[in-house]
UniProtKB/Swiss-Prot annotation:
UniProt feature coiled coil, ranges: 117-201
Name of the gene encoding the protein in the UniProt record: HDG3
Name of the protein in its database record: Homeobox-leucine zipper protein HDG3
Source organism of the structure: Arabidopsis thaliana (Mouse-ear cress)
Its biological purpose: Probable transcription factor. Seems to promote cell differentiation.
Domain START, first and last residues per copy: 243-475
PANTHER family, per the entry: HOMEOBOX-LEUCINE ZIPPER PROTEIN HDG2-RELATED (PTHR45654:SF93), HOMEOBOX-LEUCINE ZIPPER PROTEIN MERISTEM L1 (PTHR45654)
Residue ranges of the region described as Disordered: 1-74
Disruption phenotype: In plants missing HDG3, HDG7, HDG11, PDF2 and ATML1, increased cell division leading to cell overproliferation.
Comp. bias regions, Low complexity: 11-40
Polar residues: compositionally biased ranges: 46-64
Portion annotated as DNA-binding: 68-127
Length: 725
C-alpha cells in the first residue's frame, strides 16, 4: 500500500481509534500500559503492524521509555477506490465536497484534504519521472544520431572522384589528383560511347564500357590575355558552373572563409604587425598558422604569400558598398585601376528580398598593374556576402580553382574581403583584408620591388581606391560644386559643372578600358631599352569615339622623384608645354576647375591654348590621387561641342574623346618616416590613325605613335634628371 493512503492522525484520547490494535495489545503478555509509565492517550500504534507485536515484550519499570511514533490509519480499499474515482473527476475538491466525502466514507475532512494533496503530489512526481525518462531517451537517441552523422561525414566519399569530401582531411595535391582521375575516367566513358557508335556503323566489335551520356557543355568563359601573357598560364581554358557534387564543398569553403575573415578583420596583435608603409598591417604568418591550424587548404610550395589589412572611413552606406561588390560590372568599374576584367559565372545562393544577404556566387577576375611590363593575375573564386548584425556586413572571397579540373591558375585568394560597419552621416567603416598566394617567378624589371613587397595589390591599394571613388560619386551627386576662378575663366552653371564632371569620369573610364580591353595585334618594341605596347581598337557606332582605327600605345619608365612631386608637376597647366608634344611649345591656361574630392588636387579642369585663334581644341583633364597611386588623364575636345555641352544643355556622353595620360606609382623603395623613393610612370596614348569604318592600320601609323610616345618619355626624363652623389 502506498504511503499516500496512510494519513497521520493525532491521538486525542479517543479509544475508538485503538480498536484495530486490540489484538496486538492482548499479545503483549497482559502488560499493563501504566507499568510502562505511559498514559494510554500517548500509546503509539503502527497501522502497518499486523503481527502480534512483541516490541513491548520484556519492558520493565527500570527500562527507558520508547520514542513516540506517529500514528497512521490505513484506509480501506473501498475508501481508497471512492476517493480515486472522485479524484479523477475533481482533483481539487472544495470544502463542501470534502465534508460530503468525509461523511460518506467515515473519514475526517482533514484526512480527505491530506489524501488529495498526497495524491496530487504523487501524480506530479510520476509525470515528471516519465517526462525525464522520455527526455533522457531522446537525448541518447540524438547523441547516437549525431555520432553516426559525424562518422558518415568523416567517411563520406566524393561521388565524382571517390575521395574524402571533408575539407582539410587530405592534401590539396591529393584532392587535385583525385579530381583529375575522375575527369579522365569520365573521358574514357565518353570515348567508349563514341566507340560503340563507330562499332555499330563498321561492324567491328569493341570492348564495352558502361554507357554514360556526355554532359551538356556549360557556358564558356575565356580569360583575357594580360600584358605579356598572364600569370594564369592555362592556355585560355574555359570553365563553367560547378556541378552538383562540387557545390556543397564550395559552400562549406565559403562559410569557413567567412568565419576566418571575421577573425582576421577584428583581431589585432600578434596576428597583425606593422606593414611596409607604416599604416597598413602585415600578417604574421607564424601566428596565422597557430590561429587557423586546420586551414582552408594547405600552403602551396613555390607560392609567395601577400597579406595585409587596412581600415578607413568611406563616404558610402554599407548597402551601397555591398551592392557595388556583388555586381561585377560595378565592381570592375569602381576598381578599374586594379580589376581589369570580371565575370559572374553562377549564383549558388541568392536572397529572395534582393538585398544580397546570404548571396553566394562564383566569379573570376583579372587583376592588373597598369603597365605593359607587369603580368596580370587571374583568379577563380567564390564570393559570399552576409549581414552580421544591424548595420554590419561582410563580403569574402576564396579561390576554388583547385576544385575544378580544367583550371590551373597561379594566383590563389585565401579568405579575403572586407567588414563594413555603418557609421554616422552616411559613412561606413571599412576594414579590408587582402590575403593571396601567387606564383610570380617572372621578372618585373622596374616594378619588381613594388610587386614583390606586396604593395601593388595590398589592402591599402583597394581601400584608397574605394575612398577616392566614393568621393567622386558624392561630388557628382552633390549640387554644391566647388570651382576655382581665375583671370581667364568661364562661368559655368551647375548643369555645366555636372557635364564637365561626367566627361572627366568618362575619360577615366575609357582610359582604363583602353589599357585593359584593347584587342588585336600587340607589338613590343625594344628601341632604347623601352618596351612599348601598341594595340589597336576599331570604333564603330560609338557616339563618344571617332569612327575608325584607334591605336593605344603604352610604356612604363622610372623617375628619381617621389610620386607627389611628379603628380604635382604633370597636372599643372603652366608646365604642360614642357612635355606635351601637341602643345607645340605654347603655354596652356586653366579656365575652369571643379573639385571632386577632399584633396583639392582631385579635380576636373578645362584647359586651352593661350592663343585661341591658333587652335579650336580644348583639353579636359582629370587628376586623381590617393596614398597608393595617382593619375593625370586628359583628352582633347572640340571647342564648339564643348561649348554646347557646357552652356547649351548638350549631352556629355556625345562629346568625342580619346583619353591619354599617366598612371603614377611609388617604386616600392620608400620607407615610412624616412627617405622617399622614386616613381614608376605608365604613359598611354589613344590616337585615331585611320578614320572611317573600313579603315585599316598602316605601318607608318604605328611608327608615328611610337615616335610620339618616346619623345614624350624623353622630355619628362630630362625634367627629372638622376641625382648623383
Amino acid at each position: 500500500m502506498s504511503q499516500s493512503n496512510m494519513v497521520p492522525v493525532a491521538n486525542n484520547g479517543d479509544n475508538n481509534n485503538d480498536n484495530e490494535n486490540n489484538n496486538n495489545n492482548n499479545n503483549n503478555g497482559g502488560t499493563d500500559n501504566t507499568n510502562a509509565g505511559n498514559d494510554s492517550g500517548d500509546q503509539d500504534f503502527d497501522s502497518g503492524n499486523t503481527s502480534s507485536g512483541n516490541h513491548g515484550e520484556g519492558l520493565g519499570n527500570n527500562q527507558a521509555p520508547r520514542h513516540k511514533k506517529k500514528k497512521y490509519n490505513r484506509h480501506t480499499q473501498l475508501q481508497i477506490s471512492e476517493m480515486e474515482a472522485f479524484f479523477r473527476e475533481c482533483p481539487h475538491p472544495d470544502d463542501k465536497q470534502r465534508y460530503d466525502l468525509s461523511a460518506q466514507l467515515g473519514l475526517d475532512p482533514v484526512q480527505i484534504k491530506f489524501w488529495f494533496q498526497n495524491k496530487r503530489t504523487q501524480n506530479k512526481n510520476q509525470q515528471e519521472r516519465f517526462e525525464n525518462s522520455e527526455l533522457r531517451n531522446l537525448n541518447n537517441h540524438l547523441r547516437s544520431e549525431n555520432q553516426r552523422l559525424r562518422e558518415a561525414i568523416h567517411q563520406a566519399l566524393c561521388p565524382k572522384c571517390g575521395g574524402q569530401t571533408a575539407i582539410g582531411e587530405m592534401t590539396f595535391e591529393e584532392h587535385h589528383l583525385r579530381i583529375l582521375n575522375a575527369r579522365l575516367t569520365e573521358e574514357i566513358k565518353q570515348l567508349s560511347v563514341t566507340a560503340e557508335k563507330i562499332s555499330r556503323l563498321t561492324g567491328i566489335p569493341v570492348r564495352s564500357h558502361p554507357r554514360v551520356s556526355p554532359p551538356n557543355p556549360p557556358p564558356n568563359f575565356e580569360f583575357g590575355m594580360g600584358s605579356k601573357g598572364n600569370v594564369g598560364n592555362h592556355s585560355r581554358e574555359t570553365t563553367g558552373p560547378a556541378d552538383a557534387n562540387t557545390k556543397p564543398i564550395i559552400m562549406e569553403l565559403a562559410f569557413g572563409a567567412m568565419e576566418e575573415l571575421l577573425v582576421m578583420a577584428q583581431v589585432a596583435e600578434p596576428l597583425w604587425m606593422g606593414g611596409f608603409n607604416g599604416t597598413s598591417l602585415a600578417l604574421n604568418l607564424d601566428e596565422y598558422e597557430k590561429t587557423f591550424r586546420t586551414g582552408l587548404g594547405p600552403r602551396l610550395g613555390g607560392f609567395r604569400t601577400e597579406a595585409s589589412r587596412e581600415t578607413a572611413l568611406v563616404a558610402m552606406c554599407p548597402t551601397g558598398i555591398v551592392e557595388m561588390l556583388m555586381q561585377e560590372n560595378l565592381w570592375s568599374t569602381m576598381f578599374a585601376g586594379i580589376v581589369g576584367r570580371a565575370r559572374t559565372h553562377e549564383q549558388i545562393m541568392a536572397d529572395a528580398a534582393g538585398n544580397f544577404n546570404g548571396n553566394l556566387q562564383i566569379m573570376s577576375a583579372e587583376y592588373q598593374v597598369l603597365s605593359p611590363l607587369v603580368t596580370t593575375r587571374e583568379s577563380y573564386f567564390v564570393r559570399y556576402c552576409k549581414q552580421q548584425g544591424e548595420g554590419l556586413w561582410a563580403v569574402v572571397d576564396i579561390s576554388i580553382d583547385h576544385l575544378l579540373p580544367n583550371i590551373n591558375l597561379k594566383c590563389r585568394r585565401r579568405p579575403s574581403g572586407c567588414l563594413i560597419q555603418e557609421m554616422h552621416s552616411g559613412y561606413s567603416k571599412v576594414t579590408w583584408v587582402e590575403h593571396v598566394e601567387v606564383d610570380d617567378a617572372g621578372s618585373y624589371s622596374i616594378f619588381e620591388k613594388l610587386i614583390c613587397t606586396g604593395q601593388a595589390f595590398a589592402a591599402n591599394r583597394w581601400v584608397g581606391t574605394l575612398v577616392r571613388q566614393c568621393e567622386r560619386i558624392s561630388s557628382i551627386l552633390s549640387t554644391d560644386f566647388q570651382s576655382v576662378d581665375s583671370g581667364d575663366h568661364i562661368t559655368l552653371t551647375n548643369h555645366g559643372k555636372m557635364s564637365m564632371l561626367k566627361i572627366a569620369e568618362r575619360i577615366a573610364r575609357t582610359f582604363f578600358a583602353g589599357m585593359t580591353n584593347a584587342t588585336g595585334s600587340t607589338i613590343f618594341s625594344g628601341v632604347e631599352g623601352e618596351d612599348i605596347r601598341v594595340m589597336t581598337m576599331k570604333s564603330v557606332n560609338d557616339p563618344g569615339k571617332p569612327p575608325g582605327v584607334i591605336i593605344c600605345a603604352a610604356t612604363s619608365f622610372w623617375l628619381p622623384a617621389p610620386p607627389n612631386t611628379v603628380f604635382d608637376f604633370l597636372r599643372e597647366a603652366t608646365h604642360r608645354h614642357n612635355w606635351d608634344v601637341l602643345c607645340n611649345g605654347e603655354m596652356m591656361h586653366k579656365i575652369a576647375e571643379i573639385t571632386n574630392g577632399i584633396d583639392k588636387r582631385n579635380c576636373a579642369s578645362l584647359l586651352r591654348h593661350g592663343h585661341t585663334s591658333k587652335s579650336k581644341m580644348m583639353i579636359v583633364q582629370e587628376t586623381s590621387t590617393d596614398p597608393t597611386a595617382s593619375f593625370v588623364l586628359y583628352a582633347p575636345v572640340d571647342m564648339t561641342s564643348m561649348d554646347i555641352t557646357l552652356h547649351g544643355g548638350g549631352d556629355p556622353d556625345f562629346v568625342v574623346i580619346l583619353p591619354s595620360g599617366f598612371a603614377i606609382f611609388p617604386d616600392g623603395t620608400g620607407k615610412p618616416g624616412g627617405k622617399e623613393g622614386g616613381s614608376l610612370l605608365t604613359i598611354s596614348f589613344q590616337m585615331l590613325v585611320e578614320s572611317g569604318p573600313e579603315a585599316r592600320l598602316s605601318v607608318s601609323s604605328v611608327a608615328t605613335t611610337e615616335n610620339l610616345i618616346r619623345t614624350t618619355v624623353r622630355r619628362i626624363k630630362d625634367l627629372f634628371p638622376c641625382q648623383t652623389a
